[in-house]
């Protein structure tokens, strides 16, 4: 027998159907933020074009709320050679919409010449070392306060490879180099997240809109429309993972989970102290001064 929850599910399906008719990309940039010349920088290591949007809530908030300069590197442009030029342009447009900068990695030998996967690290150590050195030069040039990259168990070979390459790139910089690190999750949950970051509906709408600029990918699979559901599930899961079993959910309907640490003395050190939940209306200044 039909009941009120049928109406709820029917409405959810209907809004998804209507959302499929929304334009992909082609939107004017979101309102800009004035960035100081000496502003601290976030550097996102995106395994593929689109990851800068999917796990970009932290970077977006730091950009908008604290004036951080955000730059993204496409560590690869995907496995399809015929799509690489288009994917680079799609990422450029998505970054432009959000107010991020795109750092072209392909002139540095990244973006396709070497498969950024664990087996390459094992089977082609010279090619891997060249890619790590190239990425290290990018990091050294831009000197980020915060480096964002996938965690080491994020299932997808290129996500795991990007983590390994990022760590190896940091090792090329010597023991004096220091920055904060935020590990992300997408294909596989973090084993020990220590930050649940609330995402406002307006920020989420901009992330979904930015993701829609990756037109060639979302036409195949409209995964930009499932980003709100993923972020809603992060609240369900993160509230008890960080707050303890039986903890009440946070105040935000949407969130992203991260693992924060510091790269110092040639290694990644976990963030000291208890895990934290930062609501969309809370300041990030204590974590990212």
PLM features per residue range, with description:
Residues 171-199:
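Short, flexible loop segments at boundaries between secondary-structure elements
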Residues 249-273:
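Acidic, Ser/Thr-rich low-complexity intrinsically disordered segments
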Residues 8, 102, 124, 226, ...:
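Acidic, low-complexity intrinsically disordered regions
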């Amino acid at each position: 027998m039909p009941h009120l929850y049928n109406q709820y599910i029917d409405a959810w399906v209907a809004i998804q159907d209507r959302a499929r008719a929304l334009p992909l990309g082609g939107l004017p940039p979101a309102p800009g933020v004035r960035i100081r010349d000496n502003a601290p920088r976030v550097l996102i290591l995106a395994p593929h074009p689109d990851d800068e949007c999917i796990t970009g809530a932290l970077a977006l908030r730091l950009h908008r709320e604290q004036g951080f300069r955000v730059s993204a590197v496409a560590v690869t442009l995907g496995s399809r050679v015929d799509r690489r030029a288009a994917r680079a342009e799609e990422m450029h447009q998505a970054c432009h919409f959000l107010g991020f900068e795109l750092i072209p990695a392909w002139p540095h030998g990244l973006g396709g010449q070497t498969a950024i996967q664990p087996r390459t690290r094992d089977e082609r150590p010279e090619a891997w070392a060249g890619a790590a050195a190239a990425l290290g030069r990018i990091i050294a040039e831009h000197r980020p306060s915060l480096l964002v990259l996938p965690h080491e168990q994020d299932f997808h070979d290129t996500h795991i490879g990007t983590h390994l390459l990022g760590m190896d790139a940091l090792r090329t910089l010597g023991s004096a180099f220091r920055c904060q690190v935020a590990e992300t999750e997408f294909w596989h949950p973090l084993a020990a997240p220590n930050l649940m970051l609330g995402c406002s509906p307006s920020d989420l709408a901009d992330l979904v809109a930015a993701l829609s600029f990756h037109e060639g990918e979302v036409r195949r699979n409209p995964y930009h429309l499932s980003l709100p559901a993923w972020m809603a599930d992060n609240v369900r899961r993160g509230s008890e993972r960080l707050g303890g079993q039986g903890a009440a959910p946070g105040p935000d309907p949407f969130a992203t989970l991260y693992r924060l640490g510091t790269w110092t003395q040639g290694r990644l050190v976990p963030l000291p102290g208890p895990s934290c939940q930062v609501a969309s209306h809370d300041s990030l200044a204590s974590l990212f001064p």
